[in-house]
Amino acid sequence: RSQEAFIQPHPSISFLDGDIVKVEFNDIGRSIRRNASVLEKLGNQKNSQSVSLISIHEHQIPTEFSADAIDLATNTKPAMLDDNRRDLRNIDLITIDGSDARDFDDAVWAEKDQTKNNKDGWRIIVAIADVAHYVKPGDALDIEAKKRGNSVYFPDRVIPMLPEDLSNGMCSLRPNEDRACLAVQITIDKQGKKLSHKFFRALMRSKARITYEELQSTFDSKEKEQGSEDFIAKLAIPLYGAFKALHTARLTRGALDIEVPEMQVQLDTNGDVENIKDRERLDSHRLIEEFMVLANVCAAETLEEKKYPCVYRVHDVPSKDKIDGL
């Protein structure tokens, strides 16, 4: 709700017409024209980047970390191999994300299962950054993460859940760097039915950072040009093979494919909005979705088996109006 206010001069902050400022009202009540003091200048309404700042303040998203949290993140030591952490650095795990992705927090790998009783089946590994290795319950990093709940992404910036030494450092699965991870190894048959899974902590080294478009283009080219020696093509073939099996299982159980367009905001070099368009949906997107859904199913089954308390997200039966709308 908009309200007219008289802005008091500030001793150290100068502002002009069109500036966006955060204010504090000095009087009580609902007078037509209230008095207010400037607390902070966010930017000018002609600057499109100010929209992100308005949203940050409107939703009270924390942008600074405590000194204790920064100290913990800065002094983080890399994870080492031990009895509780397997060595996956010889496995060709890769990260697959959008071209504008800022964080690389999951990696995938697949190969044909060589066991005789699972002909044409697949072995899959899904690995995520082992954040729990660095963030301990109740420490300063944990407290800061609880304030945020998640990282928040804007077209021109990201407000990370953890200090950048972790979010863009030890917890980012960057290529050719050793990283602690939590992994699940899964075996499926040729119809995409899960036969087994096992969770473990590991040390991994991503072999490449691939975009969805690059993976799809590489796979499509490989399909046409058999015998390619391209490294990414060699990784793409088994990934798509496992995806095809999982997609078969999806169709068998009657899962719905509800395509909700995701918008992509493109900025120019000045940070101004240049274009807004639908993100293209490729099989490479669906591949990652199927792998992540499978990993989540494995996690849910493991927690259930161990009798650990867990919050499950269960979709309620849709109303008739929603079904009709669909």
Residue ranges and their predicted role:
Residues N270-L326:
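Extended, well-ordered alpha-helical scaffold/bundle regions in very large, multi-domain proteins
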Residues R1-R123, A132-E177, R209, Q216:
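Charge-lined substrate channels and their catalytic hotspots, especially those that engage the 3′ end
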Residues A107-W109, Q185, Q264-Q266:
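Short, surface-exposed charged micro-motifs
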Residues D100, E262-N275:
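Active-site-adjacent bridging/hinge elements
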Residues L53, A67-D71, R86-R89, S196-F200, ...:
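Short coil/turn segments at secondary-structure boundaries
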Residues G121-V135, R286-V297:
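Conserved phosphate/anionic-ligand binding catalytic regions in large, soluble enzymes, centered on
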Residues D113-T115, I188-K193, L267-G271:
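Short acidic-glycine loop/turn motifs at beta-strand connectors
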Residues V152-T252:
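Conserved catalytic alpha/beta cores of large enzymes that bind or transform nucleotide phosphates
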